[in-house]
From Swiss-Prot:
GO cellular component: cytoplasm
EC number of this enzyme: 3.2.2.27
Main location: cytoplasm
Intracellular or extracellular location(s): Cytoplasm
Name the record gives this protein: Uracil-DNA glycosylase
BP terms from Gene Ontology: base-excision repair, AP site formation via deaminated base removal
Matching SMART domains: UDG, UreE_C
Gene Ontology MF annotations: uracil DNA N-glycosylase activity
This protein's encoding gene: ung
UniProt lineage: Bacteria, Bacillati, Bacillota, Bacilli, Lactobacillales
Length: 226
């Protein structure tokens, strides 16, 4: 079988890649990429998994769909490619990071350094049509990303799940909260950030949890240039 992900996720998800729902998703995507503008590009579909192997995941930050504007999405939730304006939700994440840990916001939105330290930046749907939010919902991605959450839940080493907003928090029912750590608040979107995202201190909470678990905390300070 063709290797889809080039690390430990391949073995963990290989059974899923053989299932009818995933085959259907593949056919759907093949057509979409041929006839529409789809984000992210095909080579970045599984960036979140490529950058954060299964055994290295310490924290999961769950997003929903990729950004649907040009040059934004590159396979990591909330992150945008270098040289692209920081989107409103991410600007609010930076505000909270500053309030929580004192880190000055950087002028880019490229979160790869978090991913490389064990922060799985996972969207529940991994593709979208240009300019059409939610256009690839219900096509099979949710089934695959639910399995990713289930596999992490089954893992012996605990994970810190950061769940912003109602859709992300619906996943709590799949997580054994006696073993794993849940940090939740409203979504950082400008529509909801003032309802409790601001002041929620997710970054220091995540690091405190990691230290309790005997893990190295995340350096949430992003590099100034990328």
């Amino acid at each position: 079988m063709k290797e889809i992900i080039h690390n430990s996720w391949q073995n963990i998800l290989s059974a899923e890649f053989e299932k009818p729902y995933y085959q259907e998703l593949r056919e759907f995507l093949k057509k979409e990429y041929q006839t529409q503008t789809i984000y992210p590009d095909m080579y970045h579909l599984f960036s979140a998994l490529e950058l954060t192997p299964f055994e290295e995941v310490k924290v999961v930050i769950l997003g929903q769909d990729p950004y649907h504007g040009p040059n934004q999405a590159h396979g990591l939730s909330f992150s945008v490619q270098p040289g692209v304006k920081v989107p409103p939700s991410l600007a609010n994440i930076y505000k909270e990071l500053q309030a929580d840990l004192g880190y000055q916001p950087v002028n880019h939105g490229f979160l790869e350094s978090w991913a490389k330290q064990g922060v799985l930046l996972l969207n529940t749907v991994l593709t979208v049509r240009a300019g059409q939010a939610y256009s690839h919902r219900g096509k099979g991605w949710e089934q695959l990303t639910d399995v990713i959450i289930e596999k992490l839940n089954e893992r012996e080493k605990p994970v810190v799940f950061i769940l912003w907003g109602r859709p992300a928090q619906e996943k709590i029912k799949m997580i054994d909260t006696t073993r794993h750590v849940i940090i939740k608040s409203p979504h950082p979107s400008p529509l909801s950030a003032h309802r409790g995202f601001f002041g929620s201190r997710p970054f220091s909470q995540a690091n405190a949890a990691l230290e309790r678990l005997g893990e190295t905390p995340i350096d949430w300070q992003l590099p100034e240039t990328v």
